[in-house]
Amino acid sequence: MARQFPLEKTRNIGIMAHIDAGKTTTTERILFYTGRVHKIGEVHDGAATMDWMVQEQERGITITSAATTAQWKGHRINIIDTPGHVDFTVEVERSLRVLDGAVAVFCSVGGVEPQSETVWRQADKYGVPRIAYINKMDRMGADFFRGVSMIADRLGANPVPIQIPIGAEDQFKGIIDLVTMKAMVYTDDLGTTSDTADIPGDLVDQANEYREKLLEAVADTDEELMMKYLEGEELTEEEIRNGIRKGTIGLKFIPVVCGSSFKNKGVQPLLDAVVEYMPAPTDVPNIKGVHPETGEADERHSSDKDPFSALAFKIMADPYVGKLAFFRVYSGVLSSGSYVYNSTKGKRERIGRILQMHANHREEIPEVYAGDIAAAVGLKDTTTGDTLCDDKAPIILESMQFPDPVINVAIEPKTKQDQEKMGTALARLAEEDPTFKMHTDQDSGQTIIEGMGELHLEIIVDRLQREFKVECNVGRPQVAYKETIRRAVKAEGKFVRQSGGRGQYGHCWIEIEPLEQGSGFEFVNKIVGGVIPREYIAPIGQGIEEAMQNGIQAGYPVMDIRATVYDGSYHDVDSSEMAFKIAGSMAFKAGAAKADPAIIEPVMKVEVTVPEEYMGEVIGDMNSRRGRIEGMEATGTAQIVRGFVPLSEMFGYATDLRSKTQGRGVYVMMFDHYEEVPKNIAEGIVAKRAGA
């Protein structure tokens, strides 16, 4: 089967935003207009095509990023709808990694909300070009221009409107295209018919003012255009469009469009903007990677002629076909039934079938090409972030980094049967979601599950019951404390055992030092002259890593350290991998005790919106929770208080806030960073762990 759409006419985009800004509704409308869905699904009916998990339909939010493909004006658009709730940031992270561009949806009333900032930072990290779509222009309090200035102020971006609205709230009638300087006026409710007309007289000055700003931004992308603009010459429509495309892909500015997805207004012009201004796979830099054996830098071009390379960005358990691996093809061609090499795991895998996903319907296809996003059946060993490639030209592509869980609960199966099923079910769920982890508590024997927030764990438990028919009792949420060290130390680990027959001998000297937050664990080998043979180096690292799971002070995992092995000795007969693993573990424990250990806790970024009269009480309450107020701002009749509060102080906050503000206060929080626990609280934590 030949390629249907040339690579230049492929667009891989994500739809990202704050919860309730209207992402899923926008995606639904896109699918409706591009002819993929014959009846529009509404989120509040629980019938949206992209929200296909039962939990999503009940809660009216998007949890997993559904991938679908659509066609518009001779282009293929692969769309990933991402969740806006902070507990599911991992889904946003992995989608952005495999996309070339994104549509950021903002609510015209709320503007830039906290999760918008988080998602924006994630997109900045991956250098993803964006279009901003200011949605819900028909809502009470809709203000397009306030939205634009918030994008500039809060996100530090450079928004350039390429459209402005005609009216707002219930008077929202259409949009003015600043490229063609024509008005698009909607004449029916479905938004499928619109008339092109001249700009209404009362908006001519405003349209000219914003067109001037657009021309200035466009001229800035190209020297020739700048000369033409400065000499007062008119830029042609084609020059303006090329300039917008260049500025968008070069991350110089963010084109801003507007509409009301629910009322079907502005969706087709948004699709036009995606096709015209978002990058094709050929417009983005080559994908970088390393050779699995030599570690040398390598790259792949976005072309069918290059050797095959792809990144698995999501694993999903499907009730009909089993394990589905979603992947993005960066180069080459892949046929179903063929073998691929998983260079991350060093294993060959056979692709059973290749499926093109359309939310929750699927279509089997014989092959995929560079730039495509598809799902494969049959990959047994592949997990999120793995590279799939041609074994004759192996490469490991840059993967993704996921945050550690910040909250955990103990779960107990209700019956013996549940116990047997629970292990398998949890393993399946952990395979799908890299921010969900589980372990068995060594002291109590309980199964502990960890995640990014209460909602995240609630949904995991819900899926255990629904999909896997496992009934379990759930404990109270606990904070995921961690430990770290504050100074560098050197320490020795020596394991010698002589008890008849072959003995055991492992001996090493290591230096451990603190790293910057979020660095994880680094293991460095500085052994020279073979004082420890090469095959025993990795076991030392494994021993250290295992010892790090139980910290010195209160038994919490230790994070952000570098361990360097620099000396040691071995015995020709008695040394073994196990002996050196134990020596590594002993050295770490000895060193960590002297390295000024500290307990650290997750600190959340909290944003509370309350009517002005409750401000004093809310701020006082935040301070009593060891909070640090960062700033305040007024929006209409409400005030927004921003600050950082330790997660351990936030349990039950929703109820307290409701009672303090008579149900009128709302808040959002997301994990921000780890911070050292004050001495008096750390002592309490240690005592509690010792008593437990």
From Swiss-Prot:
GTP binds at residues 17-24, 81-85, 135-138. This is Elongation factor G. Residues 285-304 are annotated as: Disordered. GO terms for biological process: ribosome disassembly. Belongs to the TRAFAC class translation factor GTPase superfamily. Classic translation factor GTPase family. EF-G/EF-2 subfamily. InterPro entries: EFG_II (IPR041095), EFG_III (IPR009022), EFG_III/V (IPR035647), EFG_IV (IPR047872), EFG_V (IPR035649), EFG_V-like (IPR000640), EFTu-like_2 (IPR004161), G_TR_CS (IPR031157). The keyword Cytoplasm applies. Keywords: Cytoplasm, Elongation factor, GTP-binding, Nucleotide-binding, Protein biosynthesis. PANTHER family: RIBOSOME-RELEASING FACTOR 2, MITOCHONDRIAL, TRANSLATION ELONGATION FACTOR G-RELATED. It comes from Desulfitobacterium hafniense (strain Y51). GO terms for molecular function: GTP binding; GTPase activity; translation elongation factor activity. Residues 290-304 have a biased composition (Basic and acidic residues). The keyword GTP-binding applies. Its main location: cytoplasm. The lineage of its organism: Bacteria, Bacillati, Bacillota, Clostridia, Eubacteriales. Residues 8-282 form the tr-type G domain. It is found in: Cytoplasm. One of its GO terms (cellular component) is cytoplasm.
